């Protein structure tokens, strides 16, 4: 539909401009400006221009829908709502109108209206409509009808676990904790009950039932040594004398918000477009502003589509005393880094080390930010602290050793780097990134080439579609003098990552080694065309590529004092 709107507007603007009245031309121009802004995911600009077009042509259904969609994407549902109600009253209201009017009725706690709307044709979709109706029946006080609605939905294939999860939450929201726990205990909630929110909901339910030891065991089983302020607060409450409150879904409006959050998470896991997922997360955020998990999801979606300032605005809404404050600040730092504001990101993370200095994730994030700025010494200190704070039982410790190893390697500390990589492999023996990095490093040093080959072959087996790892395999075969075998691997690597200068350069070297000089020169020229002079971290060496084009690889190796190709594998 959106594409059709764009094509229609293009026809209006390009083929009908001569005969259209001036006002119609202005409306079409504003609409096209809105479309251009929407393509950039600039929701504020698109809402502005669509609004101008709509003001000039209030009855145009395309202008109306586009304006509502832009306002919903921007999170301005209050402004979108009256326009969506106009759409809903038309002959063809569409899904966007149902999304916004449903949000409006839920916000107003018009449960009778929601129940009546669900009986109409159309709607958002059968699962969302069905769950919203069930929660509306909870809000209307008709628990019998609500439970019957949940049960009816649960007979349909595909989403039974999510339906039963919501049924458990609905029971808990009205105080039937025994009924809610029975659903969780029977594992009827499926994967939804195993998410972080699902586990915390069940822990709170067990706390309401006075089964604190079971709740504590569930936390340990689910999160192990991975703790954070929210989990720490929950543990403290369970170990104390008071009763743990059920906060996950306190009422029916929160339940409807959870429907939209649940489906946003499902859609994202199914690789739906971030723009589409954002519509659902925006509604959840509108209905429940304190839904921190949805806030973090919304910010992440905005960051992924390049709307860094909007993402930062969302994250700044989390107060400093909220248990999720550190997560929001980590997200804000990530958005600042992606918006080319690394110094500000580092400032945020440094402040976080002062306010939340006991969290390993804070120090590791600072290490990553410093490493990206080539401040390897400071990065190593941050990784040191993160490793010190991370329990030995945490299986994710390998990431810290891997990151520190990279920083050590960039400083030229070969022994320390290799030691960290090998420690990472002791923790996670088949981790392809570590196997590849260490194997490739050994190849570049001309050491332990047989061991390097074994490591990289294992890495390729684990990640066969990673062009960089396949390149490493081709390169070690080349260094071992197994040139014909290297060709197949290098060609495969370039198929996977066609525009990388290093991979194309490597393929050129391999072609030269088997006598395919013209193809080698072609690859070196391709490699040169892909070199980014602004990329200081790239291994690409354009001067060496040019020299190879001038005199050939054999002459370059001789100039460098390297072994000729026929003897390249002599030292292992």
Where are these regions (language model features)?
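Residue-level detector of the short coil/turn that links helix A to helix B
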Residues: 41, 75, 109, 141, ...
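Generic helix N-cap/helix-start motif at coil->alpha-helix transitions
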Residues: 24-30, 57-64, 90-99, 121-132, ...
């Amino acid at each position: 539909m959106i594409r059709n709107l764009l094509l229609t507007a293009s026809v209006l603007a390009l083929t009908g401009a001569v005969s259209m009245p001036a006002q119609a031309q202005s409306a079409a121009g504003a609409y096209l400006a809105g479309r251009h802004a929407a393509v950039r995911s600039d929701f504020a600009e698109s809402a502005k221009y669509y609004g101008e077009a709509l003001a000039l042509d209030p009855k145009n259904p395309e202008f109306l829908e586009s304006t509502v969609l832009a306002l919903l994407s921007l999170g301005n549902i209050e402004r979108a709502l009256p326009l969506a109600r106009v759409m809903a009253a038309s002959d063809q209201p569409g899904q966007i109108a149902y999304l916004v009017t449903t949000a409006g009725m839920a916000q107003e706690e018009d449960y009778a209206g929601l129940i009546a709307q669900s009986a109409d044709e159309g709607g958002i979709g059968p699962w969302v409509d069905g769950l919203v109706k069930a929660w509306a029946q909870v809000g209307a006080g008709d628990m019998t009808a609500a439970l019957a609605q949940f049960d009816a939905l649960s007979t349909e294939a595909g989403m039974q676990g999510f339906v039963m999860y919501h049924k458990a939450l609905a029971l808990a929201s009205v105080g039937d904790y025994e009924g809610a726990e029975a659903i969780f205990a029977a594992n009827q909630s499926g994967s939804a009950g195993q998410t972080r929110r699902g586990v915390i909901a069940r822990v709170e339910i067990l706390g309401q039932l006075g089964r604190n030891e079971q709740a504590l065991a569930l936390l340990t089983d689910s999160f192990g040594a991975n703790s954070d302020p929210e989990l720490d607060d929950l543990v403290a409450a369970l170990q104390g004398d008071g009763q743990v409150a059920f906060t996950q879904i306190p009422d029916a409006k929160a339940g409807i918000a959870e429907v939209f959050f649940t489906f946003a998470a499902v859609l994202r896991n199914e690789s739906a477009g971030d723009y589409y997922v954002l519509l659902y997360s925006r509604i959840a955020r509108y209905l429940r502003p304190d839904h921190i998990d949805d806030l973090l999801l919304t910010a992440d979606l905005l960051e992924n589509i390049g709307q860094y300032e909007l993402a930062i605005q969302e994250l700044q809404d989390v107060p400093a005393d909220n248990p999720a404050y550190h997560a929001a600040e980590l997200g804000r730092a990530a958005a600042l880094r992606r918006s080319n504001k690394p110094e500000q990101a580092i400032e945020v993370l440094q402040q976080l080390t002062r306010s939340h200095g006991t969290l390993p994730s804070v120090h590791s994030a600072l290490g990553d930010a410093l490493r990206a700025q080539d401040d390897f010494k400071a990065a190593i200190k941050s990784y040191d602290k993160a490793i010190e704070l991370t329990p030995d039982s945490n299986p994710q410790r390998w990431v810290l050793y891997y990151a520190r190893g990279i920083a050590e390697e960039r400083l030229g500390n070969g022994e320390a780097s290799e030691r960290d990589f090998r420690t990472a492999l002791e923790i996670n023996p088949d981790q392809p990134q570590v196997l590849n990095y260490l194997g490739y490093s050994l190849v570049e040093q001309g050491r332990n080439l047989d061991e390097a080959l074994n490591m990289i072959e294992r890495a390729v087996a684990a990640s066969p579609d990673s062009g960089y790892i396949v390149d490493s395999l081709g390169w070690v075969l080349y260094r071992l003098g197994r040139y014909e075998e290297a060709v197949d691997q290098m060609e495969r690597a370039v198929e996977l990552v066609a525009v990388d200068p290093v991979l194309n350069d490597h393929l050129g070297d391999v072609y030269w080694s088997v006598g395919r000089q013209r193809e080698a020169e072609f690859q070196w020229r391709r490699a040169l065309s892909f070199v980014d002079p602004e990329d200081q971290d790239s291994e690409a060496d354009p001067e060496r590529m040019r020299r190879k084009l001038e005199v050939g690889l054999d002459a370059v190796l001789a100039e460098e004092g390297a072994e000729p190709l026929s003897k390249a594998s002599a030292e292992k």
